[in-house]
Amino acid sequence: MLAKFAALAALVASANAQAVCSLTAETHPSLNWSKCTSSGCTNVAGSITVDANWRWTHITSGSTNCYSGNEWDTSLCSTNTDCATKCCVDGAEYSSTYGIQTSGNSLSLQFVTKGSYSTNIGSRTYLMNGADAYQGFELLGNEFTFDVDVSGTGCGLNGALYFVSMDLDGGKAKYTNNKAGAKYGTGYCDAQCPRDLKYINGIANVEGWTPSTNDANAGIGDHGTCCSEMDIWEANKVSTAFTPHPCTTIEQHMCEGDSCGGTYSDDRYGGTCDADGCDFNSYRMGNTTFYGEGKTVDTSSKFTVVTQFIKDSAGDLAEIKRFYVQNGKVIENSQSNVDGVSGNSITQSFCNAQKTAFGDIDDFNKKGGLKQMGKALAKPMVLVMSIWDDHAANMLWLDSTYPVEGGPGAYRGECPTTSGVPAEVEANAPNSKVIFSNIKFGPIGSTFSGGSSGTPPSNPSSSVKPVTSTAKPSSTSTASNPSGTGAAHWAQCGGIGFSGPTTCQSPYTCQKINDYYSQCV
């Protein structure tokens, strides 16, 4: 993800504070999800918390803000240790202040929420395991599925669902000054090594703090916080991408200044993490009719997103595979339509070919590539769900042409290059929202199924501004045939309308997922 800015209006100051106050009670909204096995799924009674960077932070002895607008009040504290001692984070009023609502297994995130004392912009939430710990997910060799409604998110917005290698307790045990922990949403990190957090590693980030020139609620400090990141879903109703971001150091770690790299530093590639990642955006890969309103995956209504993290015989991450389910039909991810880049999933060979075809800087392999990402996925990662706008690049990297002058790989969506300006998005689309629901996690093949009527749609032919000298015709949404006899491990091997191989390479067998999709397992 290119950036994830915290934004909260002046009267509700934001900070990743380490102390805790109780002027507002903290009650986590409940959010159910399902843990699945080959025999079925069981309900898990979970909850969510909002990130500490959105919370009201004030002096421990009263209600005076420690941070207002985009500046620290240095008359109250001026050093990292001093602010950690004198300031506290408080409880959250989830619906009225942040526009966060839950119902059963559904989470709704409102973009702009006008409360009695503040106007809140966006939010970042985490799935909890009890009151004091984040829920951990070991994704390698497993499958993660959720429903999403992006019909209320247009150009310049990102309704994101992703995983990061945060400490499950929010860093409370590692950093003894942190008295808030996961309960209050502390400990965030990602592959951008963000420097906009007010507290990192149990101390404040006030030293060297520079207010943003285009965000009235944010700034950057000397320190950043880094860890591995797996973007399962970055999307609005125009475009979507899924992207692994490996780091040479997997777990949360603090960085300093431009050595952080990422969006917040002058040297983007100077840190421990791959800020760009290896992304699969169907539009960018040459299919302009696969995702969007009225397209193969129709974003005007809810659909299901399935992501599989497939291991090879050595136990390393070999492939990140994507399916959609809509109106009871399984839809395979679109095939690449870029010369020299084949496939419809993320593999090491796909990433190598894409970097070459687009002429991108290959920091992905410098940071360990897919194998290093797999090491992070083998350990517990924290689920993040957010909605945000982009003060760094207006979200053009997701849904428009970026860089704006064009070139190989620049065409990412239909939004104008003049779109996504945060001040305009906030003023013109305040009621935007994203809804995540029906989260499921389990072994591959355990979390999704399709209906029993109709025929699955195919990917129609499409055209896109050329990313290489010659564009290939679009492929239909069927798995590529492997070499040898039968379909390869995890490939499609049957279903209504499927014309490929119906047997599997030894020792795998063809397992029916539903009437429209069978898979070699």
UniProtKB/Swiss-Prot annotation:
The lineage of its organism: Eukaryota, Fungi, Dikarya, Ascomycota, Pezizomycotina. GO terms for molecular function: cellulose 1,4-beta-cellobiosidase activity; cellulose binding. It comes from Neurospora crassa (strain ATCC 24698 / 74-OR23-1A / CBS 708.71 / DSM 1257 / FGSC 987). Disulfide bonds join C493-C510, C504-C520. It is found in: Secreted. This is Exoglucanase 1. Residues 447-486 are annotated as: Disordered. Its EC number is 3.2.1.91. Keywords: Carbohydrate metabolism, Cellulose degradation, Disulfide bond, Glycoprotein, Glycosidase, Hydrolase, Polysaccharide degradation, Secreted, Signal. Belongs to the glycosyl hydrolase 7 (cellulase C) family. It catalyses: Hydrolysis of (1->4)-beta-D-glucosidic linkages in cellulose and cellotetraose, releasing cellobiose from the non-reducing ends of the chains. Gene3D superfamilies: Glycoside hydrolase, family 7, domain.
